[in-house]
């Protein structure tokens, strides 16, 4: 069974968000998602300054098995991307909730957080797959 940290919020499409001290949110994919995808070989990230919309694809994770779109769990401006993934996409596999993060977004609509799942709700999504 996958690790699902309780302090994070989740999208049913397997992205997670973590609130940072500056009010931004770090986004990545869950341990469950990286297990399904397998070994990462390439990650395409949004650009800093891009505006992303909740539910729209904004990045791509490519593994030995498949390429998968990554969806923005929150609308806002991308304020940082994890440049380490360019040379080390395997960080997504080894540390999905830490060094394998994808990007940070400064949200424009905090009400969208209400659409995200807590750990228990996300576990139910996985169980239903």
From Swiss-Prot:
Its cofactor is (R)-lipoate. The keyword tRNA-binding does not apply. Keywords: Lipoyl. The keyword Hydrolase does not apply. Residues 24-106 form the Lipoyl-binding domain. GO terms for biological process: glycine decarboxylation via glycine cleavage system. Transmembrane segments: none annotated. Pfam families: GCV_H. The modification N6-lipoyllysine is found at residue 65. Binds 1 lipoyl cofactor covalently. InterPro entries: 2-oxoA_DH_lipoyl-BS, Biotin_lipoyl, GCV_H, GCV_H/Fam206, GCV_H_sub, Single_hybrid_motif. GO terms for cellular component: cytosol; glycine cleavage complex. Belongs to the GcvH family. The glycine cleavage system catalyzes the degradation of glycine. The H protein shuttles the methylamine group of glycine from the P protein to the T protein. NCBIfam families: gcvH (TIGR00527), PRK01202.1 (NF002270). PANTHER family: GLYCINE CLEAVAGE SYSTEM H PROTEIN, GLYCINE CLEAVAGE SYSTEM H PROTEIN-RELATED. The glycine cleavage system is composed of four proteins: P, T, L and H. This is Glycine cleavage system H protein. The lineage of its organism: Bacteria, Pseudomonadati, Pseudomonadota, Gammaproteobacteria, Alteromonadales. The gene is gcvH.
């Amino acid at each position: 069974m996958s690790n699902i940290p309780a302090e994070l919020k989740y999208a049913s499409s397997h992205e997670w968000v973590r609130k940072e001290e500056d009010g931004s949110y770090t986004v990545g994919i869950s341990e469950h998602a990286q297990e399904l995808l397998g070994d990462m070989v390439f990650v395409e990230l949004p650009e800093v300054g891009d505006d992303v919309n909740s539910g729209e694809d904004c990045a791509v994770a490519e593994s030995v098995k498949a390429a998968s779109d990554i969806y923005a769990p929150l609308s806002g401006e991308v304020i940082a991307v994890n440049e380490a993934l360019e040379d080390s996409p395997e960080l997504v596999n080894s540390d999905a909730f830490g060094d394998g993060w994808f990007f940070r977004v400064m949200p424009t609509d905090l009400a969208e957080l209400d659409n995200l799942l807590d750990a228990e709700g996300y576990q139910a999504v996985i169980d239903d797959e």
